[in-house]
Amino acid sequence: MTKIFRLKSIAILFALILFQSTDAKAQCKFHVDLDYHYYFGLAGKVGSKTDTRSDYNMGGNSLTLAARYDVHPKVSVGAGVGLARYTQRYFNTLPIYATLRYKPIEKVKDAYVFTDLGYAIDSEKDDFTPGVLFNLGVGYTKMSAKHFGVNFQLGYNLKQFKYNHSNIPDLKSTRHSVIFGVGLTF
């Protein structure tokens, strides 16, 4: 399967998920999230060398779009796509991920724990670096209208990169970061 065909298939699937969510908004089970995350880099590892924040001012930014469905009043599952830029050993990523939210506290119904698991696709033409993505954290959504709210997140981000550098093929790098996120929920 070619990369272009794979990208088109993913884009069509994501568009269908978003299209379905606009038809079912009256049921309030479908949600669309547009989030910005800042990645406060803690440590990075390339081969056997580990760098910390005191060695480099590691950071990153991402913009993600996810469609979620409430399978239970406390559980929401979905899929998302995003664009991310990691600084210090600069990497651009195009992650596609699955997301899960769970609301464990009955008295604070807007608070949740979340996890995202996905993979950043490879595209040398567009300068995207492939690799595994894992997020884990807590969040809070404050709805100001039936279909509009503000979302806040704090969590942990693990990103593994696979890239070529000079004469070294398939070099692997790992980045650990704290997530600070804010976004809109529709």
Where are these regions (language model features)?
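Residues that define the transmembrane beta-barrel architecture of outer-membrane proteins
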Residues: 28-30, 57-61, 92-96, 128-134, ...
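Outer-membrane beta-barrel "beta-signal"
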Residues: 35, 39, 173-186
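Transmembrane beta-strand segments of Gram-negative outer membrane beta-barrel proteins
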Residues: 26-42
